[in-house]
Amino acid sequence: MRKTSHKKSRPTNNQKLATLKYTSHELQQWLLKTPSGREILRKERLFYMQNVQHSFGNYSLQIGLTEINLLQGNKIHNHYTVNLDIEADLHFMPFATESMDLIICPHVLEFIHDYEYVLQELYRILAPNGKIILTCFNQHSWFGLFSNKIALFKNARLIKLAKLKSQLEELNFGIAGGKFFSYCPPFNQARQFRRYRWLNKVGDRWFPTLANSFALILRKEVVTPTLIKPSSLESFQTLQPSLGTARICNKN
């Protein structure tokens, strides 16, 4: 049974659209021009490529980082991006229910007010057994520790993995896989950054949940009712007298 969550007031359409556009451009610049950003982009692009190439269906959607094609290599012919090909309010996306076979969300949740509603909308438009791949900056990391010193993160809400997994479970998403990326402090100088790359090997082995970013692969779990065969019904009917006897005995 699907659980319900407490609803909150939503921001206006203009606020949500403007916020996503502004942070998406900033994020792209940070990923391309900083040592930490370049490392994360390289690792996440590889992860996306490995996990979209075996996806099939009619429609795929990329939300965020629209200048970087992260759907490259998959077998789906019809691709959409937000906000490049279309302009969408992520709380009310202009797609039919259960129409998307693959959705990727590179660092979207951190920059959206009340991202819980976005998760609900993603669940609505995702086809049964469809796949979502999302990446998020981890609050329990170097990025979370120094978020007040990184301009990109000052207005962001870095994600707690445990809380996100709980929210996904409430929405009936199944987690099919995931990965952690980058354990280096966010140095501005490439030379300093290279000196601490050994933390990546140590982090993967000893403290993976403290990575600067993480990825999750989600599946839309659909419960299919099991039909009872006639022979099973006959077997069930033979139990009725004993069940009736049990009810009578309980009255005494």
Residues covered by each model-derived region:
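Class I SAM-dependent methyltransferase SAM/SAH-binding core
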Residues: 46-96
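Hydrophobic beta-strand segment of the Class I
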Residues: 103-104
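A short glycine-rich, Lys/Arg-flanked "PGG" loop and its adjoining helix->strand segment in the class I
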Residues: 116-131
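Acidic carboxylate diad motif detector
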Residues: 134-136
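Short, glycine-/aromatic-enriched active-site segment of Class I SAM-dependent methyltransferases
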Residues: 138-155
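Short alpha-helix
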Residues: 155-178, 182
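Conserved catalytic loop of SAM-dependent methyltransferase domains
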Residues: 175-201, 209-211
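C-terminal lobe and adjacent flexible extensions of AdoMet/dcAdoMet transferase-like proteins
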Residues: 199-252
